[in-house]
Regions:
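Charged, gly/pro-rich active-site loop segments
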Residues: 1-8, 81-153
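Short, conserved active-site entrance elements at the starts or edges of catalytic domains
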Residues: 2-34
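A generic local structural motif
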Residues: 12-15, 39-41, 59, 110
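Alpha-helix boundary recognition
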Residues: 20-21, 67-68, 106
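Short beta-strand segments
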Residues: 23-58, 64-66, 72-76, 84-86
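Generic structural signal for secondary-structure transition and capping sites
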Residues: 24-25, 71, 110, 130
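A short local loop/turn or secondary-structure capping micro-motif enriched for an aromatic residue
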Residues: 48-49, 61-64, 92-93, 140-142
Length: 153
């Protein structure tokens, strides 16, 4: 099978931003502090143009790991059109999340953690590194963001 021609960096960034704006779910990977076991879970998210907002039970492995380490790695899209995002994380209680943000999250994802008896936390993820590629011919130049700054115009 011959892959399609490699996209330009500008097209990859455009496709990545489209996916962030329109996709609903992302794979969230975490690990416990001090080399703890890795953990992977799909969660719904909202992109506000600068950060991703997710929610998970405070006492879940993902919630505990995010609080303890303040870091995550996300996988967005299918394996042959993947976006990998490494980010720093800020925990936000439902009480501290602006009402408008909670409403946007519930509206886009169809899920409102504020309505549940289980204690949830929201997490804002600030991307630090973004990579995107489809096939082997896009491995070179896959890095779109480094140190929190887009390197692709």
């Amino acid at each position: 099978m011959t892959p399609p021609p490699a996209r330009t960096a500008e097209q990859r960034k455009k496709d990545t931003l489209h996916r962030l704006e329109h996709d609903v779910d992302v794979w969230v990977s975490t690990a416990g502090p001090d080399g703890g076991a890795p953990y992977l879970v799909p969660l719904s998210f909202v992109w506000d143009g600068a950060t991703l907002l997710i929610a998970t039970p405070a006492e879940s492995p993902t919630g505990r790991n995010l609080v303890a380490t303040g870091r995550t790695r996300l996988g967005l899209g299918p394996t042959r059109d993947v976006v990998l995002i490494e980010g720093t994380v800020q925990a936000v209680t439902p009480e501290d999340l602006p009402e408008e943000d909670a409403e946007v999250f519930a509206g886009k994802t169809g899920f409102d953690p504020r309505q549940l008896s289980t204690r949830y936390l929201y997490f804002r993820i600030l991307p630090q590194r973004v990579q995107a590629w489809r096939e082997e011919n896009e491995l070179r130049g896959r890095e779109l963001m480094r140190d929190g700054t887009w390197i692709t115009p």
